[in-house]
């Protein structure tokens, strides 16, 4: 229970701070006991609230009894505060962009679809906010960022949740080389703000976010770990190579998807310390500027940590003609059956580019995955206050013979009976009657109401 106390603060002879109570006030009643863990004299913990499913479903209990869980979410807030301060100190503007969008752009992902009744049109939950932020660069802002809730109707695992938090930032008159240096400074700053040091422990690994980070091209990475050079290869050659490596691929995959599958299966997991993978093939990056030295590549990097991507950045494509061709390539992939390809051309975004967008670099960071590394949590569910879960199944209730008798009598009388008459008809001893009705009430199967001068028991539907 919650009790308010009024009194005088004093210090005991042994130095303990105490209150000499003058008045108690009852504030709130608790109907359920907390599952408080107990530590025995040998240091063993008993009755710990550590069942993962129960913890995620009842986070309010988890936060109350497990201090380490509360500490994780305090650090999560520190991360957002530190990152926001870093951007604000650089003079960049925090903005808000739509969650409901008419075209699901800015990423290759399957969207959630909903319907706007008033406008009678389909809308999509945001998969990314990239195209709206670029519109703001066109509008004259030189640096904008947003912490956004994004939604992708895809699989769930220890590092993916259908609803997640991303940060995206766009800065005019910069390129991806500048953004790599900016990212190094940002992540070192955030690690120190959250943990007091740039070094963190994640599982068996010691990760150091201190700048600078290693840089490896996508082509060199794949060649190093597989011996296969992706340069200049056709879609058929990439398909055959992936099959030969034992990678599961299908006919709907284009060149970009095939290269992505090869890198993900054979290379990605080898990068433990922060490493920039740079210069992606053009087919993998429909919104990225062509590489200044090689027209087959793009000026893009992904930052890998412990075998997973935590940041993705480009020198942004600002040529509306080139951008239209990339969108058309995406449409061809969508028609071929790639459900992650965007099958809709965003004409308004192309129109914005036609008004002119300065050279710009943009970066997105997966905030949930980043805080996993900074708090040594291997599961994304541990860093989300209320992770997505299947609906809770109703527990099967085993009834005693006496409880079954009462239920049967109620059902035979249209689910309700006079309480006194029911008790006589059931012919149970006082002890068995009390136990049976208490059990049925506890499981919310019956309720008793007053009808005039008599009491009525009825089944709860």
Task: Please tell me what each predicted stretch does.
Residues 398-426, 435:
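Short amphipathic alpha-helical interface segments
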Residues 85, 240, 408, 438-439:
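Surface-exposed charge patches
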Residues 16, 416, 454-456:
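A generic structural signal for beta-strand entry/edge sites
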Residues 106-107, 442, 459-460:
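Short Asp/Glu-rich motifs
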Residues 396-403, 450-461:
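Short, cationic-aromatic polyanion-contact patches
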């Amino acid at each position: 229970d919650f009790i308010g106390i009024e009194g005088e603060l004093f210090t005991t002879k042994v130095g303990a701070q105490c209150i000499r109570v003058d008045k108690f006030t009852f504030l709130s009643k608790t109907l359920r006991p907390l599952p408080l863990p107990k530590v025995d004299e040998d240091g063993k913990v008993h009755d710990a609230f550590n069942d993962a499913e129960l913890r995620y479903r009842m986070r309010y209990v988890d936060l109350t009894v497990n201090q380490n869980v509360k500490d994780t979410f305090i650090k999560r807030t520190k991360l957002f505060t530190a990152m926001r301060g870093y951007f604000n100190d650089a003079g960049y503007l925090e903005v808000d962009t739509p969650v409901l969008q008419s075209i699901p752009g800015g990423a290759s992902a399957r969207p959630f679809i909903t319907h706007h009744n008033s406008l009678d049109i389909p809308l999509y939950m945001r998969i990314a906010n990239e195209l709206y932020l670029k519109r703001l660069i066109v509008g004259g802002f030189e640096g904008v960022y947003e912490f956004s809730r994004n939604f992708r109707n895809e699989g769930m695992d220890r590092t993916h949740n259908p609803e997640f938090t991303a940060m995206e930032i766009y800065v005019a008159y910069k390129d991806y080389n500048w953004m790599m240096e900016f990212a190094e400074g940002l992540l070192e700053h955030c690690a120190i703000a959250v943990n007091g040091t740039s070094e963190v422990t994640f599982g068996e690994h010691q990760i150091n976010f201190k700048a600078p980070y290693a840089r490896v091209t996508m082509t060199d990475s794949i060649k190093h770990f597989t011996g296969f050079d992706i340069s200049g290869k056709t879609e058929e050659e990439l398909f055959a190579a992936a099959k030969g490596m034992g990678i599961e691929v299908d006919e709907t995959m284009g060149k970009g998807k095939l290269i992505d599958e090869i890198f993900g299966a054979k290379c990605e997991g080898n990068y433990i310390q922060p490493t920039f993978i740079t210069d992606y093939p053009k087919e993998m990056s429909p919104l990225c500027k062509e590489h200044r030295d090689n027209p087959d590549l793009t000026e893009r990097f992904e930052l890998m940590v412990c075998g997973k991507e935590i940041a993705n950045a480009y020198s942004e494509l600002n040529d509306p003609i080139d951008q239209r061709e990339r969108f058309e390539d995406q449409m061809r992939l969508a028609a071929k059956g790639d459900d992650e390809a965007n099958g809709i051309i965003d004409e308004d975004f192309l129109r914005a580019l036609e008004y002119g967008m300065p050279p710009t670099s943009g970066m997105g960071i997966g905030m949930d995955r980043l805080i996993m590394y900074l708090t040594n949590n291997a599961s994304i569910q541990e860093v989300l206050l209320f992770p997505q879960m299947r609906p809770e199944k109703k527990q099967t209730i085993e009834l005693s013979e006496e409880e079954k008798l009462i239920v049967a009598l109620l059902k035979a009388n249209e689910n309700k009976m006079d309480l006194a008459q029911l008790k006589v008809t059931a012919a149970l001893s006082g002890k068995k009657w009390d136990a049976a009705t208490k059990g049925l009430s506890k499981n919310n199967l019956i309720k008793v109401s007053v009808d005039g001068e008599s009491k009525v028991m009825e089944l709860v539907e």
